[in-house]
Amino acid sequence: MAKEDTGVTAPKKPETAQVANINGIDKLEPPKTKEETESSKSVSSEKAAHASDESFKRSIHEASYVGWKQIGGWEDKDELTLDDELMDMTRETFLDNIIPDSLYGDWYHSVAIFFIGGVASFALGHYKFSMGSAFFVIVITSLLYRTSAKKYRGSIRELVQKEFTVQKVENDYESLEWLNAFLDKYWPILEPSVSQLIVQQANEQMATNEAIPKFITQLWIDELTLGVKPPRVDLVKTFQNTASDVVVMDWGISFTPHDLCDMSAKQVRNYVNELAVVKAKIFGITIPVSVSDIAFKAHARVKFKLMTPFPHVETVNIQLLKVPDFDFVATLFGRSIFNWEILAIPGLMTLIQKMAKKYMGPILLPPFSLQLNIPQLLSGSNLSIGILEITVKNAKGLKRTSSILNESIDPYLSFEFNDISIAKTRTVRDTLNPVWDETLYVLLNSFTDPLTISVYDKRAKLKDKVLGRIQYNLNTLHDKTTQRNLKAQFLRNSKPVGELTFDLRFFPTLEEKKLPDGSVEELPDLNTGIAKVVVEEGSRFAEEEQKVTAYVEVYLNAKLVLTTGKATDTGTLKWNSDYEAVIADRRKTRYKFVVKDGKGEEIGSTIQTLNDLIDRSQVNKNLIPLKNQKGDIKITTYWRPVRLEIGSNSVAYTPPIGAIRVFIEKANDLRNLEKFGTIDPYCKVLVNGLSKGRTDFKSQTLNPVWNQVIYVAVTSPNQRITLQCMDVETVNKDRSLGEFNVNVQDLFKKDENDKYEETIDEKAKVGRLVMPKKKPKGTITYYTSFYPALPVLTLEEIQDLDKVNKKKKALELRKSAIDEKKISKEDKAKFDQEWNEVKELEDMYSNRQKLDLPELLQYNQGVLAVTVLNGELPDSGLYVQAFFDDNGHPRFVSPRIPSRIVKNGWSGDVIIKELDKSITTFRVAKNKNYNRVEKCVCEVELPTQELVKNCYYKPSILHLSGEGSAKLMLQISWFPIDTKQLPANDLITNSGDLTIMSRSAENLIASDLNGYSDPYLKYYINNEEDCAYKTKVVKKTLNPKWNDEGTIQINNRLNDVLRIKVMDWDSTSADDTIGTAEIPLNKVKVEGTTELDVPVEGLENAGQDGGMLHLAFSFKPRYTISVSKREKKVGDIASKGLGTGLKAGTTVIGGGVGAIGKIKKGVFGGLGSLTNHKKNHEMGEEETKF
């Protein structure tokens, strides 16, 4: 669109012109086409894209004048000198020397002058003088008034100066003149940039805002300045004797324009007041409206609630002690000679002040205040601060109203915030002493709004009658979150009409916390919380260029909870409606979105589980296709966990769709955070920000090689998988080296039966590590694969399905008995809701199999879900860790348990590769980061298969023993993975104990002068410098026979290489290496003995024949642990390796899973006892009895 000619010529810009460059884009250049313009970060790309399509005819208009310099026409020559600033504003006039001082200069003198001028004009007219004679009266009156008014303004300035000079009566207010002086100096410098930013943002929004009527073809700010005079802080008062974590302050703030009277033209160009000119183009006519000389004065009270963690301020309460005094000049048609002052309308200013008091009163005026939750605002979620649990017990002594219609009282309670009902109890029939015993959960946005509890009488054909109300102050819940057996009086006409007994509990929203290194602390994976669903927009509902009118109905678990407004357009329809709800069971919560046209006919619909909606928002896949490809709808979902104490629902596990295998090979060029030395890096895998597994750390390196596999369970294809590199810290928290999100969308493929397929991606991928506010540095090389889970029903879902089938039969019977003509609309809507809920649940469970436990146990690979319901620990402040198979680090860890009794449970999962050989270990530790070999308080170890058998159908108690004893109540679920076998690298046959039988050698190289050697062998694993095992020495021979045997630990048989050094023993000097050999350990068979003849290569030249070694190997598979115990030292970490192997004849210490032979009582309560096990667990040979 061409730039509009407003008929006003902009003045020449000064050399210091304001630059409108935001994020590399000049916002004041003429608007470009959609293809040329890149979206601003302040507006979504969708909004920017639609700004130029057919439905958005407005363009972003350029402002004519911005900033005080452009508004005032200031140029460099107008800079005030010292003489200009000292110019006398009370310059005398001719009449000052003639008229006595007592006859002019006060307000009543001005009244007298106008009175005399009026009388003189009347006299001239009465005596038939000509019109010209009135000119002399006007001149004389004007001169007298100018002289008197000028003196009067001078006297006012002197009075103000006197007020500043005289010492005030003592008070406890303080001034902030240092801040005012700072603003006076820098405000004229900052104001042009601030005004420019306001204009850019406002004009951009007004060009894309659909709420503006279509007949307004353009709307923009044409001129804007905040003036050269900044706001002032007039007074500050800090209250004493408040709590240590509470700060209360009074602030007086004012904003007053300059008095431009008696100033010279040069001074006026330097003292510019506030001005805003907004122009609207309506039917081709440009209409300007200007607002200038804005003045206000406010007195506010601010309360800060402090806390220890960042941002250190928990809440801020703002209260205006009175309605602010404000004034302004508003004119229609701008500053032209035809302008019309809007406030000249009689009574308009009074009306504005009254309306301000009416609408500000319930929010900002005493006793109310506006509460801001700072952590919530910083998180950007804009959700409620928590959930309020209301347990209504009973009411006593309700009194009837005087109405003659009250034959019986059927009371129920309604809970309200700001006259909006948020929850209701059931109705109790015909009683004045109702008992409800009902628990309700409501969203709480602020502690400052009182909770209104109204008791109503339910009436069939009349409106329900209010019997009484309670206004309950919730401020006490901030410090005391649980309040039992509260009693409050219902009031009617300020008289008690009954008493209510109830309980209140507040559960706060759990927010993410940023750590000093920029990383975000993990939130617990809870099943309860707050969900906010925003229906933003929709598209493709009709053919191109066809105008569509549509709205959306949102159903939560088959109940209609939101109906958006109607939107009409030819392209994208925008609704931007949201619904926030308390979620008691996230995994079972589902939303149905139905798009209907203007006539109420359905266009399309989609059913999404809450988990899927959350995952879509995590990976920015918010556009959801409707059924039968009838369009798309954009849904954004916000989720915050809340730890509700409602039993196992809060920690219930969501069934997975499969497992992703992440093979983490290595990292290169990592960031070194150490001032001295080098980092000790490891890698974590996170799912939606929650840690699900990690590698071992590699000591002192920037280029670690891990070659470790981590499996993570996923519940939808839209979950966010993240690889994060960390540096080990023994004293403080581990530090982040960067992270990146893994693209796994290509792994999820379905067959013709709509079931997920196994996908193995053998191509190596490289991801660059990114840190907040730092340049990317370092890469990780990894591989990914996907193994689908068998879709099976959980025990709870089987029970739910049985209930659904029973309910369906009951509804079918009711349907056959219903008379369509006699049924009311309410009853029909209720029946339709129940029927739709049954159909949705049937559809949700229709694609899953029902398998009993014996059938499930036929699958050897699967996802093991562990839910800890409650328990008892030996002490407070401990953590419960779970280890599986060869995990050196805990697969999942409980939150810190503040007391000995475990009240709040948790859940976790792990992929079991071989159920019949798997081992599970639970440990209670003082530090959540302790690994498998570090000290614990108590532990228990048992076969995973037995754990499934004993805890699948019902929870069982697990006993842990050691320095102390503990009990945990567990519930187990088993979800088979639909694959024949996982990669050999991940199985138990890839790790274990390698027994080396060094038998003999032939034709070794002579090293001594006598033509012989004193040979022995040294064995090394891969490139390790420490010897894993060495043989005895056989002296003076080239054909030794050792017949020696030793056992070493192998963590990766298929990829490890055994290096051999043939050594010559010397009594007087260091031993010499006379040859080397290598054996890939994948040549060693898992079963039986492997005989190998290994050629030796000499050191003098490549390929030199150094003889032949005759060796034999036997391998015993078992799960090994490659972690080491960390010791704290000054400035560094010293590690004691436990997985490097030992000399011949010794036993592997700490290498295998720990024994449970020390446990003398039953692992499961009331289920018997465990037999003793060997220290080195031999898979497949032990039996566990219950």
Swiss-Prot record:
Residues 172-375 form the SMP-LTD domain. Residues 366-487, 512-636, 640-757, 976-1094 form the C2 domain. The keyword Cytoplasm does not apply. Residues 1-50 are annotated as: Disordered. Residues 795-822 form a coiled coil. Residues 26-39 have a biased composition (Basic and acidic residues). It is a multi-pass membrane protein. Residues 128 are extracellular. Ca(2+) 2 binds at D1008, D1064, D1066, D1072. Ca(2+) 1 binds at D1008, D1014, D1064, D1066. GO terms for biological process: endoplasmic reticulum membrane organization; endoplasmic reticulum-plasma membrane tethering; ER to Golgi ceramide transport; phospholipid homeostasis; regulation of phosphatidylinositol dephosphorylation. Residues 1-106, 150-1186 are cytoplasmic. Keywords: Calcium, Calcium/phospholipid-binding, Cell membrane, Coiled coil, Endoplasmic reticulum, Lipid transport, Lipid-binding, Membrane, Metal-binding, Phosphoprotein, Repeat, Transmembrane, Transmembrane helix, Transport. Its cofactor is Ca(2+). Ca(2+) 3 binds at D1066, S1069, D1072. The chain crosses the membrane at residues 107-127, 129-149. InterPro entries: C2_dom (IPR000008), C2_domain_sf (IPR035892), C2A_Tricalbin (IPR037761), C2B_Tricalbin (IPR037765), C2C_Tricalbin (IPR037762), C2D_Tricalbin (IPR037756), SMP_LBD (IPR031468), TCB1-3_C2 (IPR056910). May play a role in membrane trafficking. Present with 6140 molecules/cell in log phase SD medium. Belongs to the tricalbin family. The SMP-LTD domain is a barrel-like domain that can bind various types of glycerophospholipids in its interior and mediate their transfer between two adjacent bilayers. The C-terminal C2 domain shows Ca(2+)-dependent phospholipid binding. It binds to phosphatidylserine, phosphatidylinositol and various phosphoinositides. The other C2 domains do not retain all 5 conserved Asp residues found in calcium-binding C2 domains. This is Tricalbin-1. It comes from Saccharomyces cerevisiae (strain ATCC 204508 / S288c).
